[in-house]
């Protein structure tokens, strides 16, 4: 499907590839007004037994990004991975996507009344340039937390029956029907959706992969050299 550019603060200067089939990540990039290509890669690794959640999301994002970069070497590749961390008695567990409706119900039941962390790791692979043979990439991550409310089992069961939880980390969608499950959010909303936009945009601007639109009618742009970035 051909993308139509919408009114935007930014415009891309090089081809951009999103290495994800996630509708949430696609929607977030589209909201920026950028045109990009989606390359879905079947390269998501499983967590290792002794691997910290942060190490895992960074590794998973890097694996996805490098797989897409092999297919699109002249593009900026954006890849990400998100996990929900269930913590009890100082022991953490990585909660991925449910395998069944029963699995979804079990996850949501465990979350009730608790505060849990969401981690999104990202990897950007920059386009190969002449006389540069090594891959240039950048890793970053962001965390947020969510406080679940207390809900009756029949409500959770009804939510699971909608099918919305099927492909969501933690078995809920904060952007959809499942928003009612959450009492409190701490941190950036886009991190929970799977793509931390503030950190991503700053890096794309710094490497001049996108520019700021100064005059939306003429698409005149201002160089990112004139902008100040927070580290």
UniProtKB/Swiss-Prot annotation:
Compartments, as annotated in UniProt: Cytoplasm
GO process terms (BP): nucleotide metabolic process
GO cellular component: cytoplasm
Site (Important for substrate specificity): 24, 82, 175
InterPro entries: ITPase-like_fam, Maf-like
Cofactor: a divalent metal cation
Molecular function terms from GO: dTTP diphosphatase activity; UTP diphosphatase activity
Active site residues of this protein: 81 (proton acceptor)
Keyword Protein transport: no
Keyword Cytoplasm: yes
UniProt keyword annotations, A-Z: Cytoplasm, Hydrolase, Nucleotide metabolism
Matching Pfam families: Maf
Name of the top EC class for this enzyme: hydrolase
EC number: 3.6.1.9
Catalytic reaction annotation: dTTP + H2O = dTMP + diphosphate + H(+); UTP + H2O = UMP + diphosphate + H(+)
Job description of the protein: Nucleoside triphosphate pyrophosphatase that hydrolyzes dTTP and UTP. May have a dual role in cell division arrest and in preventing the incorporation of modified nucleotides into cellular nucleic acids.
Family of this protein: Belongs to the Maf family. YhdE subfamily.
Protein name per Swiss-Prot or TrEMBL: dTTP/UTP pyrophosphatase
Organism: Lawsonia intracellularis (strain PHE/MN1-00)
Lineage per the UniProt record: Bacteria, Pseudomonadati, Thermodesulfobacteriota, Desulfovibrionia, Desulfovibrionales
């Amino acid at each position: 499907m051909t993308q139509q550019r919408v009114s935007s603060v930014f415009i891309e200067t090089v081809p951009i590839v999103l290495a994800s089939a996630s509708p949430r990540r696609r929607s977030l990039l589209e909201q920026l007004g950028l045109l990009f290509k989606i390359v879905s890669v079947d390269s998501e690794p499983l967590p290792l037994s002794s691997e910290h959640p942060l190490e895992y999301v960074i590794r998973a994002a890097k694996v996805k990004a490098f797989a897409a970069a092999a297919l699109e070497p002249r593009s900026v590749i954006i890849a990400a991975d998100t996990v929900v961390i269930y913590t009890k008695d100082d022991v953490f567990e990585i909660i991925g996507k449910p395998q069944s409706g029963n699995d979804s119900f079990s996850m949501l039941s465990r979350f009730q009344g608790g505060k849990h962390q969401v981690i999104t790791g990202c990897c950007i692979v920059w386009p190969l340039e002449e006389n540069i043979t090594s891959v240039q990439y950048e890793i970053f991550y962001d965390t947020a937390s969510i406080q679940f409310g207390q809900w009756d089992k029949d409500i959770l069961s009804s939510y699971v029956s909608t099918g919305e939880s099927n492909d969501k980390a933690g078995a809920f969608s904060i952007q959809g029907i499942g928003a009612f499950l959450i009492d409190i959010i701490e941190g950036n909303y886009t991190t929970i959706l799977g793509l931390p936009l503030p950190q991503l945009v700053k890096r794309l601007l710094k490497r001049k992969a996108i520019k700021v639109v100064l005059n939306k009618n003429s698409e005149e742009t201002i160089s990112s050299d004139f902008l100040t970035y927070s580290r």
